[in-house]
Amino acid sequence: MENLGRKDGFYMITRQGMRTLMLLLSVIILSAPGCGLIHRERTPEEVFSMALSGIAGKEKLDFVGEAGLRRESSGLFENQFKFEGKLENHDQLTLQTRLPGAVTAAGSSKVNGMDAASANLTTQPSGFSASFQRKKGQWEALTAEQEPLRGSLSRYNPIAQLENIDRMNKTIKSEYGSGRRTRILRIELAPEDAKAWATTQLNDEMNAIKAEYMHRASNIKGKNKAKLEKELSQVWQQGEASMEQMMKQAKVQTVYHLTVDRKTSLPLRLSSESQVTYQDASNKSNKEALVMDVNFKTYD
């Protein structure tokens, strides 16, 4: 009986010791840096969602960017320009364009392979600005009636870009090259959604240009005013019909690269390339790419 009691006591001590050991091991595992139980790597979809939520909660932010059109036939950038933007009061955004060749942070007129010398905007004396207000999730241009063309700058609003990406079908993958401080996501829109969005943006810009020219025609005095307005309407109808026909047969591929800060989950950079392959009036195949690169500077 005495030996049995000792065995029972030894068994109880051993069991108690095992519980203590398991508890200590659990504490060590849970507190170990880099442990998968606590620091699970977020999926690309989760990283994008957190980045979108992070930027949506900011009252103020600043960004700078550059955009240009590249044609496959020449490989050069055309219609290149730089821009900068400022968000205030959460829903008020101002975009300001700048001429190619403006001094950059590095003091160079060439950024990300885009050579300012290839741009054709040098005839303009300066850039211009446009203001936007976010209402019910949509960005509306706050431009004067005599300056409708400024509203076409909405294409270069990176916040609206991220919001629209969220609504569309897409594939998100982690890109090689992500470091300890950042995650790089490759986001490719579904072809149907990419084409529909490109068509919508082209229509918006066509309407803005039409409104600009019709306004100028309305300021003309004399008997030729009505004739000019009629001719302009006919030209735009033909242009819209041609664009509609072109986009019906076109193929669009849009890919974004989003760099996200691992610590804050805020976007640091958003670059994109939207390639459009289409046939012109002579049935010749053409390929153009709209390239955009935005760097987010400060958040508040």
Language model: regions and residue ranges:
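N-terminal secretory signal peptides that target proteins for export/translocation
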Residues: 1-16
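Short helix-loop boundary/capping segments
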Residues: 179-253
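A short, structured loop/turn motif at beta-sheet edges
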Residues: 55-57, 172-183, 259-268, 298-300
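N-terminal leader/targeting segments and the immediate start of mature chains
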Residues: 13-19, 27-84
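Acidic, serine/threonine-rich low-complexity disordered tracts
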Residues: 79-81, 230-300
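Extracytoplasmic beta-rich ectodomain segments of secreted or membrane-anchored proteins
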Residues: 139-186, 191-194
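An acidic-aromatic
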Residues: 84-156
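Generic short beta-strand segments
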Residues: 64-70, 99-102, 186-197, 232-238, ...
